[in-house]
Swiss-Prot record:
The protein's name in its UniProt record: Probable 5-dehydro-4-deoxyglucarate dehydratase
SMART domains: DHDPS
Keywords carried by this UniProt record: Lyase
GO biological process: D-glucarate catabolic process
InterPro entries tied to this protein: Aldolase_TIM, DapA-like, Dehydro-deoxyglucarate_dehyd
HAMAP family: KDGDH
GO molecular function: 4-hydroxy-tetrahydrodipicolinate synthase activity; 5-dehydro-4-deoxyglucarate dehydratase activity
Transmembrane segments: none
Entry's EC annotation: 4.2.1.41
Catalytic activity: 5-dehydro-4-deoxy-D-glucarate + H(+) = 2,5-dioxopentanoate + CO2 + H2O
Domain of life: Bacteria
Pathways per UniProt: Carbohydrate acid metabolism; D-glucarate degradation; 2,5-dioxopentanoate from D-glucarate: step 2/2
Amino acid sequence: MNRKAPTGILGFPVTPFDNQGNIDELALSQNIKYLLDSGLEAIFVACGAGEYHSLENGEYESIIEIATSTVKGQVPVYTGVGGNLSDAVHKAKLSEKHGVDGYLIMPAYLINGEQEGIYQYVHSIATSTDLNAIVYQRDNVVMNLDTIEKLVEIPQIVGFKDGHGSMEHIIEFTQSIGNKIGWLNGMPMAEVTMPAYIPLGFDSYSSAISNYIPHISRKFYDALLEGDETTVNEIYQEVILPINRIRRQGKGYAISLIKAGMEIVGLPINSNNVRPPVTPVKKEHYEQLEEILKKALIKYPSNLTKSL
């Protein structure tokens, strides 16, 4: 087992549904292949963007099978696990059964546990299999240094994904723990904050826009690493910040706006097909995104883009 967290740009594919509400398995496979062809360094299925909260166990298992058969070992495949502890452990074992590389331990939503409770929750999941595990901090699951230091002693834990955004805490974590684990930026629209995270030791991020304009996220990240401030600022102003402004207009847009972007560029998905409580993108916001992408793809064309 390679005890190392993925680095670079991480793909978090959405789960496409057909008009009857079932998983569109062909579309899922095609969209994962699109991410692979675009050079993403890892695939994380059935996580937040994949509407993990809405998936039945059978659907979850099907998604894993599709992901592993499509990826075929080209890059690491991770799954999302979380929710109630027994279900999280069950999904962790399903993931191990189907040969994935690891899983992202999602926050236990709506439960504000003490630090010891958070530790026991993560420990129970991480030690239930021999797979790599990445801890995800966001919303109501915010850890202190003592908790993180205890967690990194668990051999299965290879990474920490931050979706909380407290620079003071992150500096304390990275300075105290160093390279014992990998550091992943999991903030909403992670491209927005990646320039602040790189100097702290973060060398990967989950990219929502890579589901539909992966070449632009790649160009942005390469420019960051190369110190090309002109390109960074251009992509910030023309693509990233405008899309982020739309994303903030609706709850659930972290998912449905991805589907809208995919549909706009011609990928096989119906952006209206999301599961409650997520709702589709409103018409005005869809049109705003469409206009941004039209301009972006003129300036930054892609051979993989099928539309526009």
